[in-house]
């Protein structure tokens, strides 16, 4: 049986913006906004963090804490999965903790993609020169990602 969980990595010690997960957005911490939208999907949703301040917002039932210095959110998700914490799930959706504009519709698009592919990524056609914005270099013939980067892509 297929069982899917949403994992939201949320690192306190970000090199670009320390404490970003708890930044207040209209009276609610950003990470809580992301979490609340993800739970609208009906899927079990968990926050993965390195810091007690974030852990205390959710508690042990909805949050996994590991102070290992992972390089990125994907590594944090892999660490939690490898640890066995999520043994009852066999599919995972990694939603970035700094994506307060995520919608349940995006989650459903990912679920639909996972019915066909082992890995799926949602991206928007939105050229950006912002080094904080991750860009996807994709193969237009196969509609697959070749790489992800924060640097400017040549065709922009």
PLM feature segments, named:
Residues 1-18:
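N-terminal nucleotide-binding beta1-loop-alpha1 segment
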Residues 3, 43-46, 118:
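Residues at the starts of beta-strands that form the adenosine-phosphate
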Residues 8, 48-50:
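Conserved sequence signature across two-component system core domains
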Residues 9, 94-96, 122-125:
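Short beta-strand segments
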Residues 20-25, 63-64:
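Short glycine-enriched, charge-decorated loop/helix-capping segments at active-site entrances
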Residues 29-47, 56-59:
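A short, N-terminal amphipathic alpha-helix
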Residues 52-95, 99-109:
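Short phosphate-binding loop-to-helix
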Residues 102-156:
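Conserved core of the sugar-phosphate nucleotidyltransferase
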């Amino acid at each position: 049986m297929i069982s899917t969980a949403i994992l939201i990595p949320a690192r306190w010690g970000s090199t670009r913006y320390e404490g970003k997960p708890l930044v207040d957005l209209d009276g609610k911490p950003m990470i809580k906004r992301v979490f609340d939208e993800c739970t609208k999907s009906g899927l079990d949703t968990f926050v993965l963090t390195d810091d007690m301040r974030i852990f205390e917002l959710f508690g042990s039932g909805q949050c996994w804490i590991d102070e290992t210095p992972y390089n990125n959110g994907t590594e944090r998700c892999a660490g939690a999965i490898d640890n066995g914490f999520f043994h009852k799930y066999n599919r995972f959706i990694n939603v970035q903790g700094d994506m307060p504009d995520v919608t349940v519709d995006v989650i459903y698009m990912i679920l639909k993609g996972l019915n066909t592919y082992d890995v799926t990524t949602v991206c928007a056609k939105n050229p950006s020169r912002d080094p904080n914005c991750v860009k996807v270099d994709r193969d237009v013939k196969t509609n697959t990602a070749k790489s992800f980067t924060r640097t400017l892509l040549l065709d922009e």
